[in-house]
Each structure stands twice: as C-alpha cells, then as structure tokens.
C-alpha cells in the first residue's frame, strides 16, 4: 500500500506541475526570399524603392503573424528582361530593433554592384 500511495502522489505531483508550467516555446528566425522584375525602362532606383517597400511589408507581416519570431531575414532579388538575377538588398533585423525603428533603409544591406548587372 505504501508503494501505491507513493506512486499515486508522484503522479499527482507530475500532473500538477504539467498544468502549472506549460511547455517551453522556442523563438526562431523567419526567412523570406522575394523576387522583383526590373520593368522595361525602369530606373534601378525605382527597383530599390520597390525592394524597400516589399522588405518592410514582409518584416512587419512576419512579426505581426507570429509572436515567437525574434528575427527576420529577407533577401530581395531583382531580375532584368535578360533573365539576369542578382541580390538587391538583404534585411536582417530583430523584433526589438524593428519595434524601435521600423525603417528598412536603416537595417538593410544594399548590393551596389547590382545596378550595373541589371541595367
């Protein structure tokens, strides 16, 4: 009888602990790859402007949709009419950084050589 009481008590303690302490949640990084086409006679600066807007929307949407996301990495690739595709910008930002300053231009890395390759 002593063993049954001991096992019953430990089972009750385990059940109580499981109810009080929920399972641990894990934070993670959201990764997004976006592709934009450089339109006929469109200046490269316009493509960069569109890339900034797309990256900003992607980052905001990622943080809004999932509270466990702690960091967002977005790569924007541009493609010209000849089928040449090159990275235009890469945005890597934490939730805390984004909440303090949600500005793509502040956190993004721009690839300067992309303009020459796409035009």
Named regions from a protein language model:
Residues 53-62:
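N-terminal post-signal-peptidase region of extra-cytosolic proteins
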Residues 27-30, 37-43, 49-52, 65-119:
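Polar/charged, Gly/Pro-rich intrinsically disordered segments
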Residues 1-14:
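Bacterial N-terminal signal peptides that target proteins for export
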């Amino acid at each position: 009888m002593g063993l049954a009481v001991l096992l019953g008590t430990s089972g009750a303690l385990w059940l109580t602990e499981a109810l009080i302490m929920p399972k641990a949640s894990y934070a993670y990084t959201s990764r997004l790859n976006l592709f934009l086409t450089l339109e006929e006679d469109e200046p490269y600066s316009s493509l960069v402007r569109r890339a900034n807007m797309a990256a900003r929307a992607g980052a905001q949407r990622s943080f809004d949709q999932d509270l466990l996301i702690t960091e967002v990495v977005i790569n924007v690739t541009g493609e010209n009419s000849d089928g040449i595709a090159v990275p235009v910008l890469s945005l890597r930002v934490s939730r805390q950084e984004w909440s303090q300053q949600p500005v793509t231009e502040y956190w993004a890395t721009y690839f300067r050589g992309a303009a020459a390759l796409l035009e």
